[in-house]
Amino acid sequence: EVYLQKYIEETNKVISFQKDCGIEVIVSGELNRDNYMSYIGEIVDGVKLLTLEELKELTGNNENFRKSLEEMDASDNSMNSPICFEKINTEVRLNKKEIEVLKDSSVEHYKCTLPSPYLLTRSMWLKEITGNSYDSRNELGEDVVKLLRHEIRELVKEGVKIIQIDGPILSEVVFTNSKSDNSFY
């Protein structure tokens, strides 16, 4: 309850700042997110949020894991990653709380962001764990797309003016580690 109140207060500050700057399409500031996609692990049934140390224990290939983290400048164990442990619930709302706060603050036009299906699938796939529920990363990806399509439909119904699909490290993933079975970023 205290966290929720603080989240709402700080989000309202972000909204006020944007309005004061003359920004016409407002964003929440994503203050409820550890990073651009880890919040999925807190919301979606079938997904758990794991620390990099927990991931390292599950993979068994510590050297490749360490290298992949160094390549992505994430070796300080400050990042959490959503990992799929069972079939995911594709009907859950991802950005419901963000939208409620935006609506409650009388914002006329607002934007919402979602992680890209490719990076979300790639992050959630851990062969040693996810392979027990999905036959392939592609099969998991199909459910991730269903999840995102469901959220997009709901966002449109709620009047979201812009929906941004984030893939901030996509080029690095594609060009540096495209053949990896597991990735942690």
Specify the residue positions occupied by each region the protein language model found.
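Domain-level signal for soluble alpha/beta catalytic cores
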Residues: E1-Y185
